[in-house]
Amino acid sequence: MARKEFRYRGYTLEQLMNMSLEELARLLPARQRRSLRRGLTPEQKKLLRKIRLAKKGKYNKPIRTHCRDMIILPEMVGLTIYVHNGKEFVPVEIKPEMIGHYLGEFAPTRKRVQHGAPGIGATRSSMFVAVK
C-alpha cells in the first residue's frame, strides 16, 4: 500500500511553502496563530535567517538554538535543528507532520525516572533483615 501524501488542513507541503506567514497563520491553532500575529522575537528572526541560509546551502554548521518557543514552519521541513533542553542540544529532524508545533515539544527537558532495585531499608519488611 502506498504511503499517503501529507496534507495540513487540506493543503499540500508545496502549497504551504508558497504561503506567506499571514496566510499560514490562518491555518494554525489559536495559540500559534496569536503568537505569529504578534510577530517573531529577535531570536526567532535570527533562527529563521539561519534556516533560510541553510536551505540555500550557504550555512554549513549545524543549526543550534535555545529558541524552544519557535513554531515549526513549512520552510523548516527536512532540516535537523539542535534544540537546547537545558543541559545539551538535542537533534530534532523536522518532518511535515510537525508543522504548527513548537520546537521545544520535541526536545524533552526532563529525563524519565528509571528506578533501580530497592535497597535494604527501602520497605518496612526489609528494615530488620541481616545485611550478612
UniProtKB/Swiss-Prot annotation:
Gene3D superfamilies in the record: 30s Ribosomal Protein S19, Chain A
Pfam families xrefs: Ribosomal_S19
InterPro entries linked: Ribosomal_uS19 (IPR002222), Ribosomal_uS19_CS (IPR020934), Ribosomal_uS19_euk/arc (IPR005713), Ribosomal_uS19_SF (IPR023575)
Membrane-crossing residue ranges in chain numbering: none
GO terms under cellular component: cytosolic small ribosomal subunit
Top-level taxon of origin: Archaea
GO terms, molecular function: rRNA binding; structural constituent of ribosome
Signal peptide residues on this chain, from the entry's feature table: none
Xref: PROSITE patterns: RIBOSOMAL_S19
Keywords: Ribonucleoprotein, Ribosomal protein, RNA-binding, rRNA-binding
Any one biological process term the GO annotation gives: translation
Family from the record: Belongs to the universal ribosomal protein uS19 family.
Known function: Protein S19 forms a complex with S13 that binds strongly to the 16S ribosomal RNA.
Name the UniProt record assigns to this protein: Small ribosomal subunit protein uS19
Organism of this sequence: Pyrococcus horikoshii (strain ATCC 700860 / DSM 12428 / JCM 9974 / NBRC 100139 / OT-3)
Gene coding for it: rps19
